[in-house]
Amino acid sequence: RIPFEKIYRSFTRDQYEQSRLERLRARFRYWTANFDLAFGFTDATTDTTNLSTALELRRNKKRLDFFFGGYYWFRSTKESGESRVTDENRLLGRARLNLDLSDRTFAFSQLTAEYDEIQNLSLRADQAAGIGYRFVDREKLMISGRSGPGYVYQRYFGGENDNYFTILFGGNLEAELPYGSKFRWGAEYLPEVSDWQDTYLIRTFADWALPINGWLDFKIAAINIYNSQPEEDTENNSFTTTAGLSFRF
C-alpha cells in the first residue's frame, strides 16, 4: 500500500496513455511551475505600455523544498509630440532551498539578484543562510519565519558600490482560500550589522491566484522594495502591482 500523504497526483490509465502532459506531470510529480503574463496598452493623449512576466519553479519532496522565481516589469509613456519615456525597467530573480531538520524546523539558503534602471541600480545581489521555523503548518495554512547572516552587494550606474554584512529576518505565509484560490505573502528585512538603524533593505511580496480552469489562473501580484540609502535623485520606495493570467504546468 502507498501511504495517502505520498500520493501527489492521481489519474486514470487512459489519461496517462493518451496525454503527453499527464505523463510529464507523473515524471516530474514533485515539481510545480507557473508562467505569469500581464499586458496593458493605452492610445490617447498619453500613450502607455505595460508588460509584466514571471516564471516560478518549485520542487517539494520530503525534507527538501526548492524555489526559483524570475520576474520582469516594464512600463513606458509617450506624451503627444514627445519622445517615449521609460518609467519602469526592472528584473529580479530569487532562489531558496529549505532542508527540514524536524517537523517544524528547517535550514535555509537563499540568493536574490535585482536590476532596476529607474533606481539607477546596476546590480543588487544578496545571499543569506540560517535557520527557520514553521509556527503554523496545516494543510491549508503555513506561516514560517527564518533568520541568518548574509551579505548585500549593490552596484549603481557610474560604478559606485554600497556593500554590507547583514542578518536577514524573513517570514512567509501561504494559505488556501475559498473557491480554490491561494494567497502568498513574504517579507524580508536586511539591516546592515554595523548601522542597522540607518542602512537597511525591506522587500515584500504578495499574490492572490483564482483558478479559471485546470491550468489557468487569474492572478493579482504586488512587490514593494524599500532601500533606506538609495542612489542620489531616486526614491527610497519602489512599488508595483500587476493583474493578469498565470499558466500552471
Which positions does each model-derived feature cover?
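Residues on the lipid-exposed face of transmembrane beta-strands in outer-membrane beta-barrel proteins
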Residues: 35-39, 53-59, 95-99, 129-133, ...
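Outer-membrane beta-barrel domain signature
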Residues: 22-26, 40-46, 80-86, 116-122, ...
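Transmembrane beta-strands of outer-membrane beta-barrel pores
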Residues: 39-43, 61, 72-76, 113-117, ...
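Detector for outer-membrane/organellar transmembrane beta-barrel domains
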Residues: 140-191
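Predominantly the C-terminal beta-signal and adjacent terminal strand-loop region
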Residues: 194-249
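Compositionally biased alpha-helical segments
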Residues: 1-42, 47-48, 52-56
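Residues that define the transmembrane beta-barrel architecture of outer-membrane proteins
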Residues: 47-51, 87-91, 123-127, 141, ...
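Repeated loop/turn-to-beta-strand initiation elements of outer-membrane beta-barrel proteins
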Residues: 62-68, 103-107, 138-143, 177-183, ...
